[in-house]
């Protein structure tokens, strides 16, 4: 692939023939409530459909449509093919990346890597990085998955049916920081199924007792398995995916527990990273004894959603605690 052929292809797509397509893509992004990553996924799917999956022509069309929407894009040549490079506002794991003029760009598509790359560097006024944050889940058509029944020793039982279309979208999400997963809300249909029985279970309880019940729900109702054992690779789940996949590990449970505590108890939470482990810490309004982290003027009591029977503890030692 020669540089002049790339320039000619860019001139071809930017000459006005695809302006209506670009406008329709932006309109569809709004209609579906897509975040920036969702828009890229839409553009990639459309371009692959028009031009053939993972072809050079598809990459050129993707770069034009993303640039037209204001995103910071570049292209690279290597191994006889073109690659789309996208700047993001946060780190993406397990993807090739390039530092171009102080900005990190990633190859987000799952394509074979080249031995070396030549960057086609250009700038467009007003361009911005792609955000990985998801202010709200996308509004996909409903395609019900099998109902997931989660039972905590007869104390509380939940039955949740998630949207398989949303699960497919989450499956393709680029691996990124846990804060992105933790900040993503549950969809309204899932909240409508999940929250009534949980609210009934914590009704009339104090903060600590209510948090402990939610914690034991995570301990007892969700079988544990490492990502390597379940998926073959490291993978963090969005909270809603806990009702789609049969197993979960420490960060998945911590993310769902944080979401339940925020939504049902109205308490502030943070995630804590230990070597090879993640836990949650809760800022209780009343006095709750236990190990804690002080952040500013707030005291966050450490809670662990992985080790059976634990609400508060001194250290997350796998030698001393059984994983659920």
Language model regions located:
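Catalytic Cys-His active-site segments of thiol-dependent hydrolases/isopeptidases
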Residues: 292-306
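Sec/Tat-exported extracytoplasmic proteins
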Residues: 65, 69-73, 198, 202, ...
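Active-site neighborhood of thiol-dependent amide/isopeptide-bond enzymes
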Residues: 49-62, 225-285
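Mixed-charge, low-complexity segments
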Residues: 1-123
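Conserved small/polar residues in nucleotide/adenosyl-binding loops
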Residues: 313-322
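Extended, non-transmembrane interaction/recognition domains
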Residues: 71-186
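Solvent-exposed coil/turn segments that connect beta secondary-structure elements
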Residues: 284-287, 306-308
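Secondary-structure boundary elements
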Residues: 4-43, 180-244, 306
């Amino acid at each position: 692939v020669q540089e002049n052929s790339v320039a000619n292809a860019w001139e071809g797509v930017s000459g006005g023939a695809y302006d209506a397509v670009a406008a329709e893509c932006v309109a569809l992004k709004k209609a579906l409530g897509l975040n920036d990553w969702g828009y890229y996924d839409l553009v990639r799917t459309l371009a692959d459909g028009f031009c053939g999956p993972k072809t050079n022509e598809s990459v050129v069309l993707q770069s034009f449509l993303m640039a037209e929407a204001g995103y910071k894009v570049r292209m690279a040549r290597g191994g006889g093919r073109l690659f789309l490079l996208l700047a993001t506002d946060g780190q993406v794991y397990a993807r090739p990346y390039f530092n171009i003029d102080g900005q990190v760009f990633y190859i987000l598509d799952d394509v074979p890597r080249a031995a070396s790359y030549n960057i086609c560097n250009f700038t467009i006024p007003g361009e911005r990085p792609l955000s990985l944050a998801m202010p709200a889940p996308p509004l996909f058509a409903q395609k019900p998955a099998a109902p997931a029944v989660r039972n905590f020793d007869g104390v509380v039982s939940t039955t949740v049916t998630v949207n398989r279309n949303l699960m497919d979208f989450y499956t393709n999400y680029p691996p990124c920081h846990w804060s992105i997963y933790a900040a993503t809300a549950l969809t309204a249909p899932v909240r409508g199924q999940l929250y009534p029985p949980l609210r009934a279970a914590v009704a009339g309880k104090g903060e600590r007792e209510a948090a402990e019940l939610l914690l034991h729900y995570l301990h007892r109702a969700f079988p544990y398995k490492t990502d390597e054992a379940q998926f073959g690779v490291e993978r963090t789940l969005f909270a809603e995916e806990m009702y789609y996949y049969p197993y979960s590990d420490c960060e998945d449970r911590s993310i769902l527990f944080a979401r339940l505590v925020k939504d049902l108890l109205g308490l502030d939470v943070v995630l804590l990273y230990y070597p090879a482990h993640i836990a949650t810490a809760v800022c209780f309004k009343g006095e709750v004894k236990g190990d804690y982290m002080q952040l500013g003027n707030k005291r966050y009591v450490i809670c662990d959603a992985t080790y059976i029977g634990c609400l508060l503890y001194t250290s997350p030692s796998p030698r001393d605690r059984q994983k659920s």
